[in-house]
Regions:
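ATP/adenylate-binding site constellation spanning eukaryotic-like Ser/Thr protein kinases
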Residues: 9, 22, 48
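Phosphate-binding P-loop
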Residues: 14-20
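Conserved lysine of the Walker
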Residues: 33
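Hydrophobic anchor at the beta1->P-loop junction of P-loop NTPases
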Residues: 25
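Conserved P-loop NTP-binding catalytic core
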Residues: 38-95
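N-terminal pre-Walker A segment at the start of P-loop NTPase domains
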Residues: 1-13
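The conserved Walker
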Residues: 29
Length: 208
């Protein structure tokens, strides 16, 4: 993903942002950092066709509209990958979102892939080959929350170096086992991780 456009979502009335491989958000409390990150979780739930459940468990439709549904009547988003894109528009239905538009595009050409359902069509759509790239990306979106680094942090929990090595848990419970697996199986990748950290924290030497 190299560009994202969001309209009407939470604290974002109209946002257009070019993305790099690594993006750092800096701002005061309430400036929208958490809302921006939450949009990627929103995207993943949308792709997995679990948007209705996700919205219901996170405060209902009104919580997702910019300044509420009395001010905003639609959430629109476009995510771009070089010369291809995926876009959608959500409006309020009967206590749930309705897709008023869902499209795949290539340069200036676009194809409607679904409308007026409560869940996205992108996961099951197979009409365009460009959809496969976008599906793969959306399916792999994960939110990791590593805010708590105190004594009771998930980082301090024990993890099994065999059973907990396959993917990183959302709160970092298995960070040690996950990094150990990378160190043992793909040392080049492990060293790259260390060097990236050192690029912003030169005093860091290693994880052990």
């Amino acid at each position: 993903m190299d560009r994202i456009e969001i309209k009407g979502y939470k604290s974002f009335k109209d946002l257009a942002l070019d993305l790099l491989p690594i993006n750092i958000l800096i701002g005061s409390n309430g400036s929208g950092k958490s809302n921006f990150l939450s949009f990627f979780e929103f995207l993943n739930r949308l792709y997995e066709q679990k948007l209705t459940e996700y919205v219901a468990l996170n405060g209902g439709i009104d919580k997702f509209f910019f300044q509420g549904s009395k001010i905003t009547d639609a959430i629109c988003a476009t995510i771009g990958f070089k010369d291809i894109f995926y876009s959608f528009e959500l409006k309020e239905g009967d206590n749930r979102f309705v897709f008023s538009k869902e499209e795949l595009g290539n340069n200036s050409l676009y194809t409607a892939i679904g409308a007026f359902g409560n869940e996205a069509s992108i996961k099951s759509y197979s009409g365009l080959s460009i959809g496969e790239h976008i599906r793969r990306y959306l399916s792999e979106i994960k939110k990791y929350h590593f805010h708590d680094t105190g004594k009771t942090s998930p980082f301090t929990k024990e993890s099994h170096i065999q059973n907990d090595r396959y993917y990183l848990y959302e709160k970092g419970d298995n960070l040690a086992a996950f990094l150990y697996a990378i160190h043992e199986e793909t040392p080049i990748v492990y060293n790259r991780i260390v060097k990236v950290i050192q690029s912003i924290a030169p005093y860091f030497s290693d994880f052990y």
